[in-house]
Amino acid sequence: MIKDLYKTWNIQSHNIHGEEFTGYEPVYDQLDQLDKPAFNKDPEATVNKVFDIYRSINIVPILYFTEKGLINAIKEFKSTSYNAVKNSKISLGNNRGQPLSRFLFPNMMTAEPKGRGSNSLKDRFYNDTKLKRAIRICYEMREGHKLVYPTALRRALELVTGENIQNFKPQNARALVEHLCPVLWGNVYDYSAGYGGRLLGISCSN
């Protein structure tokens, strides 16, 4: 399975830097130098430099896993506490597991909003104009350090055009299924369980 995922994400052996990786670890020092003062001094040149760095590696900026890293991350996810359903409501939070879902379900990164062809998050990353727009968003809407690291860039790509496929939070799926079926080893039918975070959350429930 892991080889198929790597093929889908275009991950090569030289992109792997630890059990959890973005593939951009070797260029973090370069990205650190392209900070907010650098952008304020010369916005266009800074955006172009960041763009060139990302194109030099050219993989979608999400968190990836080795097989061992994936197993460890799923175990950690399963042992993490979460907000259960109370009075037919789930409290805010329950964000754990989202990086796992992005990696395990590439369809979440390639799904397109209805009527907007070539507008998936993956398409936006490989579109030069949209990638540069996302880089600019990183500088214009955030302060601090690591402004153009992969996580920040992914979030900015989600803002480009403003239309995104939303994943179901795995921990919310886990909370719902255990609320609906509190019996250990019970069965719940979910017609969309295979699409994204619902499958991860349900498979880690009781």
Residue ranges and their predicted role:
Residues E163-L184:
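Conserved alpha-helix/loop element of class I SAM-dependent methyltransferases that forms part
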Residues A175, Y195-S205:
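Conserved SAM-binding loop of SAM-dependent methyltransferases across substrates and taxa
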Residues V183-G194:
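Conserved class I S-adenosyl-L-methionine
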